[in-house]
Amino acid sequence: FGVNIIVHPTNIRVQADLEICVKHKVPLVITSLGAVSQLVDTVHSYGGIVYHDIIKKRHAEKADEVGVDGLILVTAGAGGHAGLKNPMSLISLIKSFYSKKIILSGCISNGRDIASALQMGADIAYMGTRFINVKESRADEDYKKMIINSTAEDIVYTACVSGVHGNFLRPSLEAMGITEEFW
């Protein structure tokens, strides 16, 4: 199992979340929105590993400098905070200097997509949104329905939610009172 920790300075829970990870010796910690050496060192101290979400080369370089164990390339089409680079170009760029494990995410939803990710050079294909609608998911039923009923036309790439660009569904933005003029 793993835990995702957003390490951006606006996340006031980082230290508390990290302490829980240490207490329970969480084997995999996924970080995003900042690469923090202290967090990596702490997770490594109990034998855990850290993978870091990246959308650009400079993010990968920073994560590599702090000693992460692998990178998650969050490419165009990924849900939530995501980049605009297509998977083919980003994986080629990152593999040109990075030799540790690479996970590819973004628009991966079936076996063909997984095979394509592996063919491009990813070590692992990462599907997230696809699993929100499984019966084991604790996601809100209205959220599950929104995903099922939405189309590609409902995906909005915007920074209006957190200040960091990401892909969000139009109905979720509208439910937050964020209308098209703010996208």
Regions found by a protein language model. Give the residues of each.
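Conserved active-site-proximal phosphate/metal-binding subdomains
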Residues: 87-103, 109-183
